[in-house]
Design a protein with these regions (language model features):
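Nucleotide and nucleotide-moiety/phosphate-recognizing core
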Residues: 121-124, 133-138
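N-terminal, polar/charged subdomain of small-to-medium soluble alpha/beta proteins
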Residues: 1-124, 128
Length: 138
């Protein structure tokens, strides 16, 4: 499966457990790996056949700025759900939300959460291979 990557998208948003984090806001960095097929887009040289990473970056920014979460785990989960439902051709994604200004009182580069979510095929079958087969269906 092919990948389109967005690395270190900087978003200023209001997420965190502490009241000050939700009032003042802080910087978050988002990495997104979008799993899709780029074959047709590559052969036709046509953006309509691919996932527009500019649109995805704008959607991530808007989503994180318009919603408030206490945990970056919750932000990642809801953002993944939104992107999967919105994005045509997106089969799976890996999101990492980094919180470089995390208020832990110790020197660190960043704290982050990384999740992978995607679509799964499900099959529904009717009937049985035992007994009165047509009777079960009817």
């Amino acid at each position: 499966m092919d990948k389109i990557k967005i690395v270190d998208l900087e978003v200023f948003a209001n997420h965190g457990v502490f009241e000050e984090e939700q009032k003042l806001g802080q910087k978050f960095l988002v990495d997104a790996v979008l799993y899709t097929s780029t074959r047709v887009a590559g052969k036709k040289d046509n953006l309509e056949e691919s996932i527009n990473y500019g649109d995805i970056a704008a959607r991530i920014t808007k989503f994180l700025q318009e919603n408030t979460f206490q945990l970056i785990e919750a932000a990642a989960e809801k953002l993944a759900e939104d992107l999967l439902l919105y994005t045509k051709g997106l089969e799976q994604l890996t999101l990492e939300i980094k919180k470089p200004w995390a208020p832990v009182g110790l020197p660190l580069k960043t704290v982050s959460v990384e999740i992978t979510r995607g679509w799964h095929e499900a099959y529904i079958a009717f009937g049985s291979n035992m007994g009165e087969k047509m009777g079960y269906i009817q």
